[in-house]
Amino acid sequence: MCLLAIQYRSVPEAPILVAANREEAYDRGSLLPSIQAGKPRILCGIDTKAGGTWLGVNQQGLFVGVCNRHKMLSPLVPKSRGVLCREMLRTNSSRQAVDLAMEELSTGKYDGANFIIADQESGWVVHGTDEIEVVELPDGLSIISSGDVNDLRDERGKLCRRLLTLQTLDSAVKFLARASQAFSRPPAPEGRPGMVNRSKERGTVSSTLIALGKKPRDAIFQYASGAPDQAKYEDYSPLLRDILSRGLREARTRAKA
């Protein structure tokens, strides 16, 4: 499970703003965000068990994230949702990523998942349950966890929205500052929704803040390797700016050819 908030196309200089807390078993290892070789280049963390990822950005400015969710009819030996997320990041647009998700999920070989997909052209959520549903991402703030996007029955989602909208989020700086506080909120008492989860064997294991601007130099990628109420956000923005600049150069070269 995870908690992800995306502010989409409501801040002109930063059309994609993301905050996400990842929940996983504590003994499931992962690697810090790094640039993955291949085309297109990807910046993401890697799950060492399956080799997939939970979220990332590619050099075309495509964001893809995945949140696990319940599914009634689970396959006996499910394919990795994280590997699918990584494969979606190898596509060149949000629409291509949606097509790949639909093609793979329709095989019935995956456990339940929500895929959040966005670039500057379009944004989507794929609800991968027993019935697959594609929902266009609305402009503004959307929140998703283990249910449908912007599910009014999700108490954790409602808490997240309340914390993020205590002030107007009309710039990347304001969104990231507010999100870093909200997503670092310590665990709530038992029985109440919280931003950071902590139990004996699993809980919040990392947190990510992302801003994708119109220009590569404006991109931000911050990552906390641990629950963000205890671990500090470290800056990986130079890596993100590097791959976005590479993507822009390659696009200009193709246009001249």
Spans of features found by a protein language model:
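N-terminal nucleophile
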Residues: M1-A257
